[in-house]
């Protein structure tokens, strides 16, 4: 037993010694474009923390007027103040948005449209992970509501402004976890069977399928859309799982920082020449492969129609 513990300790010590080299290998791609955003308007959901916050920081640094749309306004204001001080850009604004509540989503959109006549970039960044089973006030399972339906509705409500401001982009944060996902139309809300891990995977697959179908419907409008896997990032997304929090802490030297995790979102929001790749899935700042289920056009169209029915909207 002592020998095993000794070997394990030696192995972990070795890993931590070579951690900088491993970190450099897993850091991933970097957004290389020097595009400036003076006069441009951006909305980022969940930008009060993590990847979203770093994305907002970089877009503000480039001169954009950035709206941090988040549930916790106090944390949002704290993030905005930090970004303003760091970038010397005072145009970082915070607005209340609870993606688990369709009334909040509609209120945010109504306020934004009254306030702004342009919208050039929408980044659907917010998300939840590994939540115990629960339903929102609208009767939707939490992962489905926040990660998919909330952003589906928000994009629907803001799309007119995006079209008016074209060229414009919609970036949807997904995950490599979509490979384990399946759209279970017979039990979309998890009433018959629920697993908090798979619920997250299903919602991330929904993000990729939404992006695929949205791109098809936006052809010729000047608005393009991209799905993004940010990488395995040191963030608070795993806060609902004690085991993952422990693993994240143990392996934190090997995980991406939030700055690194933001790079692919920035690439898809800013890089020149991406228009022909609308609807595609990106990781480490390049197009990458998706699961067979994520390439199913019939599933994408059906999910679109079911989402419209659940939300009571008609998407022209």
Curated annotation (Swiss-Prot):
**Descriptive protein name:** Retinol dehydrogenase 12
> What GO MF terms are annotated?
11-cis-retinol dehydrogenase activity; all-trans-retinol dehydrogenase (NAD+) activity; all-trans-retinol dehydrogenase (NADP+) activity
Q: Name one GO biological process term.
A: cellular detoxification of aldehyde
UniProt-annotated catalytic positions: 200 (proton acceptor)
Give residues annotated as binding substrate: 175
Going by the UniProt record, its keywords in alphabetical order are: Lipid metabolism, NADP, Oxidoreductase, Sensory transduction, Vision
Q: What is this enzyme's catalytic activity, as reactions?
A: all-trans-retinol + NADP(+) = all-trans-retinal + NADPH + H(+); 11-cis-retinol + NADP(+) = 11-cis-retinal + NADPH + H(+); 9-cis-retinol + NADP(+) = 9-cis-retinal + NADPH + H(+); a 4-hydroxynonen-1-ol + NADP(+) = a 4-hydroxynonenal + NADPH + H(+)
Which residues does NADP(+) bind?
A: 46-52
Gene3D superfamilies linked to this entry: NAD(P)-binding Rossmann-like Domain
Protein family according to the UniProt entry = Belongs to the short-chain dehydrogenases/reductases (SDR) family.
Which pathway or pathways does this protein act in? Cofactor metabolism; retinol metabolism
Gene that specifies this protein: RDH12
GO cellular component labels: photoreceptor inner segment
* Functional description taken from the UniProt entry: Retinoids dehydrogenase/reductase with a clear preference for NADP. Displays high activity towards 9-cis, 11-cis and all-trans-retinal. Shows very weak activity towards 13-cis-retinol. Also exhibits activity, albeit with lower affinity than for retinaldehydes, towards lipid peroxidation products (C9 aldehydes) such as 4-hydroxynonenal and trans-2-nonenal. May play an important function in photoreceptor cells to detoxify 4-hydroxynonenal and potentially other toxic aldehyde products resulting from lipid peroxidation. Has no dehydrogenase activity towards steroids.
Question: Which InterPro entries does the record match to this protein?
Answer: NAD(P)-bd_dom_sf (IPR036291), SDR_fam (IPR002347)
Q: What is its EC number?
A: 1.1.1.300
Q: Which organism is it from?
A: Bos taurus
Superkingdom per UniProt:
Eukaryota
Instruction: Quote the record's miscellaneous comment.
Output: Shows clear specificity for the pro-S hydrogen on C4 of NADPH and the pro-R hydrogen on C15 of retinols.
Could you say which tissues express the protein in this record?
Answer: Expressed in the retina.
Keyword Transferase listed? The answer is no
């Amino acid at each position: 037993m002592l020998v095993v513990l000794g070997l394990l300790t030696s192995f972990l010590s070795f890993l931590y010694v070579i951690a900088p080299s491993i970190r450099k290998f897993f850091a991933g791609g970097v957004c290389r474009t020097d595009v400036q955003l003076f006069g441009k308007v951006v909305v980022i959901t969940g930008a009060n923390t993590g990847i979203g916050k770093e994305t907002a920081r970089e877009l503000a640094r480039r001169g954009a007027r950035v709206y941090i749309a988040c549930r916790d306004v106090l944390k949002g204001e704290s993030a905005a103040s930090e970004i303003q001080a760091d970038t010397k850009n005072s145009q970082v604004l915070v607005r209340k948005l609870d993606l688990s509540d369709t009334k909040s989503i509609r209120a945010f959109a109504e306020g934004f449209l009254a306030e702004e006549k342009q919208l050039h970039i929408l980044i659907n960044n917010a998300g939840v992970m590994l939540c115990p089973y629960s339903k929102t006030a609208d009767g939707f399972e939490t992962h489905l509501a926040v990660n998919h339906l909330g952003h589906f509705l928000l994009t629907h409500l803001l799309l007119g402004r995006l079209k008016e401001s074209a060229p414009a982009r919609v970036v949807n944060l997904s995950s490599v976890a979509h490979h384990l996902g399946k759209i279970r139309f017979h039990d979309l809300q998890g009433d018959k069977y629920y697993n908090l891990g798979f619920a997250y995977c299903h919602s991330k697959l929904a993000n990729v399928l939404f992006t695929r179908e949205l791109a098809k419907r936006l052809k010729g409008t000047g608005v393009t859309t991209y799905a993004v896997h940010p990488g395995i990032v040191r963030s608070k997304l795993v806060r609902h799982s004690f085991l993952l929090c422990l693993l994240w802490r143990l392996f934190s030297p090997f995980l991406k920082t939030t700055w690194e995790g933001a790079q692919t979102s920035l690439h898809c929001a800013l890089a020149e020449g991406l228009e022909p790749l609308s609807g595609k899935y990106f990781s480490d700042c390049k197009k990458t492969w998706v699961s067979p289920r994520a390439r199913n056009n019939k599933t994408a169209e059906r999910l679109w129609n079911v989402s419209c029915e659940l939300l009571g909207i008609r998407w022209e």
